[in-house]
Amino acid sequence: MLVKFKISNFLSFNQEQTFSMISGKVRSKQDHLISYKKQKILKFAAIFGANASGKSNLVKAMDFAAVTILRGLPINIMDNYCRTSELNRDKPTKFEFEIKIDDRYYQYGFSLLLYKGQILEEWLYDVTTPSTKTIFERTVSDEPIVLSKQFSGEARKTLKIYAEGMQSNESLLYLTEMNRNKKDLYTKYPVLKPLRDVYRWFRGKFVVNYPEDPMSPAYFVD
């Protein structure tokens, strides 16, 4: 389930903006909410606004992020930064999702320079409890990947090997790489399950539809 989505420096979005499915303080319509621990999440939401106010661009931002996660950076993206200021050309664009999978909450995101088609950073956290737990943090440079302390032994060594093999790859996300023909990896090391679960959520649960797209009954099947 999508809980939050944050976007900055993309199309009409300049400063960071947040789309949140967390309920406000209104106590009516409790049947429209999903309760988990102390949090109440909306089952559905609608976005209202004038023409050219950014509604479609929010959907495009979600779609762009999902495509990048599942397939790699799209082509012809150099002008997709927010062009209200020419300075934005050299500023990072940031996408971040907070999602709920079973009884866990994850925060996954990445930043990139659209003008150069260059991924800069990537991160995945477990935010189920108030104490955020790092699963991994990646900076596309010479810096080594930061991994959770729960990964040890051969599992940790394997993660580092894959990270080192793509450390300078500026067009591919680590989460994507860790889900390319690696089914046996998660059977051998179940502790790595969060990397598989988050990717599978984007592949199987996160569906972006545009107004002109035909609606399939399959979209309504959980």
Regions of interest found by a model, annotated:
Residues 7, 97-103, 124-126:
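Short acidic, glycine-rich loop/turn motifs
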